Amino acid sequence: MLIIGERINGMFGDIKRAIQERDPAPVQEWARRQEEGGARALDLNVGPAVQDKVSAMEWLVEVTQEVSNLTLCLDSTNIKAIEAGLKKCKNRAMINSTNAEREKVEKLFPLAVEHGAALIGLTMNKTGIPKDSDTRLAFAMELVAAADEFGLPMEDLYIDPLILPANVAQDHAPEVLKTLQQIKMLADPAPKTVLGLSNVSQNCQNRPLINRTFLAMAMACGLDAAIADACDEALIETAATAEILLNQTVYCDSFVKMFKTR
């Protein structure tokens, strides 16, 4: 299970201020904390309030790399910002994200191939997020076909079946789990899968409990990666334990510590 730390995001007040003031301290503190917590990649999102998203993304990449060698997941709807961030990355990166719209596919798949980056593909188009598994899977098939068309290795494609909050779209969760299982049958080798895990508990009570419960369920259905709160100790313990019980890693008495430090 690849944990992608979610916290360096301009939607959070401290990161928003850090970007506005070009203060690296909060960004670097969260990079360190998430890596110590068990993250093996860091999502970087400048947030919606920033006017110059290109320079903001460049800055985020630079200051994060000063303290961390983890994979950086460049999270933006602004393709120019993603491209600028990729050029600043010292190590292999991940693009977050494209949907199945042809216009975006034709730009972001070649960009990922050019930079040797992994790419997150969303199972949706401009009409929105599907309610059922069959429609999600149809979009996943389009993304798999695009990877083949543009030469993106299948193991570098991370398909996100898009979970919504349990308090407003409770019926989506079983459909997402079903989609996770089916995605693994679309190609050989199969594409990877990823979820924005915290979305499942947005505006809910007991968010950490919902997050870690759904993580274990999703892992049992084949989930490979999650953009999540890497500083939630119980969440990381759940991920480490699920790997053992799914026979994905060999048991040792210090399995949680091993998960965090591998």
From Swiss-Prot:
Binding, (6S)-5-methyl-5,6,7,8-tetrahydrofolate: N96, D160, N199, Q202, R207
Residues marked Transition state stabilizer (site): N199
Taxonomic superkingdom: Bacteria
UniProt GO BP: carbon fixation; homocysteine metabolic process; methylation; tetrahydrofolate metabolic process
Catalytic activity, EC: 2.1.1.258
Cofactor: Ca(2+)
GO molecular function, one term: calcium ion binding
UniProt catalytic activity: methyl-Co(III)-[corrinoid Fe-S protein] + (6S)-5,6,7,8-tetrahydrofolate = Co(I)-[corrinoid Fe-S protein] + (6S)-5-methyl-5,6,7,8-tetrahydrofolate + H(+)
Domain (Pterin-binding) ranges: 1-246
Subunit structure: Heterohexamer composed of 2 subunits of AcsC, 2 subunits of AcsD and 2 subunits of AcsE.
Role, per record: Methyltransferase that mediates the transfer of a N5-methyl group of (6S)-methyltetrahydrofolate to the 5-methoxybenzimidazolylcobamide cofactor of a corrinoid/Fe-S protein (AcsC/AcsD) in the anaerobic acetyl-CoA pathway (Wood-Ljungdahl pathway) of carbon monoxide and carbon dioxide fixation.
Protein name listed in UniProt: 5-methyltetrahydrofolate:corrinoid/iron-sulfur protein co-methyltransferase
Originating species: Moorella thermoacetica (Clostridium thermoaceticum)
Gene: acsE
